[in-house]
Amino acid sequence: MAPIPPTPAQDISILHPKVLLLSAGITTSLFLGYRFYTRYVRRVRTYLDLTPSIIENNKKLYGYVTRVGDGDNFRFYHTPGGLLMGWGWLRKIPTTRKELKDETLMIRLCGIDAPEGAHFGKPAQPFADDALNWLRGYVDGKYVTITPYSIDQYKRVVARAQIWKWTGKKDVSAEMLKTGYAIVYEGKAEAEFGDNEDWYRKLEAHSKRLRKGVWSLGKKLTTPGEFKRVHYRGE
């Protein structure tokens, strides 16, 4: 009995449906893997990791507040993916200053200015401690979502910060304006509001009418911007 001849090899074109399907599958897998990595794995450690696309596309970053340093800024440790990626139970969030070195963003709350604390031998403004204590109680040691808008001259990330409370998601800048412990940011060159400037100004006007916080000072009020111009810039 004659042997069965082998099946001749077939040359498959790169345009063959099977090849195209396989290529599409590999490309899709790589793309989804990259998206998963950038969204849920890769950390933004410092302001140097903030790419133009993150800022231009208003990408939200989820993370943990490690320290509140002033009435309108705090340290933010990025935890991509949050609890679903093990943060807080499988993946440890650093707590010591040494561990946190070069691992956090300094966040400057957008659209507002809080009373200046005592710095460099200069006196604190009225309500500076109230603003600091309020912000500590509201966000310190808690998870927040930030939307970076820009990086200022001090390498701080000017951002909108939002936090979940029992009554829903809250805008931290807006809540500070409601208390009267902050005013709408006066500087024009570095002002960042997102789409919320009109809303912020209405909240400020309401607190002013009720004479809440700094507005209780009446004509004695020196705004944070004025205070900095006099005490730090010698104007």
UniProtKB/Swiss-Prot annotation:
Residues the record lists as binding Ca(2+): 113
Enzyme class: hydrolase
Its EC number(s): 3.1.-.-
Residue positions of the active site: 108, 116, 156
Family annotation (InterPro entries): SNase_OB-fold_sf, Staphylococal_nuclease_OB-fold
TNase-like domain residues: 59-217
Protein name stated in the entry: Probable endonuclease LCL3
Species assigned in the record: Candida tropicalis (strain ATCC MYA-3404 / T1)
Gene: LCL3
